[in-house]
Swiss-Prot record:
The gene is aroA. This is 3-phosphoshikimate 1-carboxyvinyltransferase. CDD domains: EPSP_synthase (cd01556). SUPFAM superfamilies: EPT/RTPC-like (SSF55205). GO terms for molecular function: 3-phosphoshikimate 1-carboxyvinyltransferase activity. GO terms for biological process: amino acid biosynthetic process; aromatic amino acid family biosynthetic process; chorismate biosynthetic process. It is an enzyme of class 2 (transferase). Catalyzes the transfer of the enolpyruvyl moiety of phosphoenolpyruvate (PEP) to the 5-hydroxyl of shikimate-3-phosphate (S3P) to produce enolpyruvyl shikimate-3-phosphate and inorganic phosphate. 3-phosphoshikimate binds at K21, S22, R26, S143, S144, Q145, S171, D288, K315. It comes from the Bacteria. Its EC number is 2.5.1.19. Transmembrane segments: none annotated.
Amino acid sequence: MRYLLSAPSQIKATIQLPASKSISNRALIIHALSKGDDVPSNLSDCDDTQVMIKALTEGNEVIDILAAGTAMRFLTAYLSSTPGIHTITGTERMQQRPIQILVNALRELGAHIEYVRNEGFPPLRIEGRELTGSEITLKGNVSSQYISALLMIGPVLKNGLQLRLTGEIVSRPYINLTLQLMKDFGASASWTSDQNIQVDPQPYHCLPFTVESDWSAASYWYQIAALSPQADIELTGLFRHSYQGDSRGAEVFARLGVATEYTETGIRLKKNGTCVERLDEDFVDIPDLAQTFVVTCALLNVPFRFTGLQSLKIKETDRIEALKTEMKKLGYILHDKNDSILSWDGERVEQQTCPVIKTYEDHRMAMAFAPAAIHYPTIQIDEPQVVSKSYPGYWDDLRKAGFGIKVGEE
């Protein structure tokens, strides 16, 4: 299926954003480890979170997390520290995503994990048990989800956890998000130096908890505001002082012409009348916003150089290659370097007359390219249903904002 999109001449809308996927998934694991009754409220309705809920509540011996990478990593650590024998698997793409770094770390703590098929990749057979190890050293540039997975089980380890990170630490805000949520549930977990984290063997407390709205989802509305001639967009459920690292996107979008006003219910986006001539930005802490800013900058004719993108190659797809391929359809030639830098210097080619954007089973490809309809009235998005992974109501919300969406021709 494809969606053919058309955009209104001006955007005026109030949008209730989905709950944060990042917070929901962490809160669910911590709640399960607390063994309490107060289930977190306002959980995300996205695929990833629903997969997590099913895995934690049904207790099946074989757990299929489909395409949910967060669930694969968090559940691998959770199941390793919880009595029981389980096999955890996923889609074909999930079985191609490496997990050896996390498995090796868990084995150092005493976990019993076997690879069912290919060494270093899911599916995994996990025999949960009490883990007695307490010291782990990891490179700081590994996925922050590996680090978060280990941190969250720290309080239930017999001797707690001392985690040392070497070299550059990527996605530090996601690590801080995990630590803050752990503290909210009564854990003693903190940085003891710039590279070391200490988690004491202190049980979680089950407490009432409400999940805030998703700043990652907000980024697509910032993008729409930046690309639209006129925009007045209210987004509810967002906080000025958010746990989410992606809230930094507001600062970056301010340089691309979008002003943020904080209100009692959330935020209001308007044009601020200014836009930089070039954007150089390090995305090491906000990798999930990279696709949004690539499309936005190019369509605003703002050359850019984005660094810190090393984690993009192991996401739902190789996002660097996907961006280069799909942006070329719109007439933009991007260049990458060292698997971590993506740039556009203004180089153009003839655009396709009716571009069809391939989404590669990646929700963020669909949502980052859909706002391009403001500049490309014939654009089509392939496999639009992929947005259910993080923002199931995305297309309905676009309709509320005045976008035309109809099923395109295959």
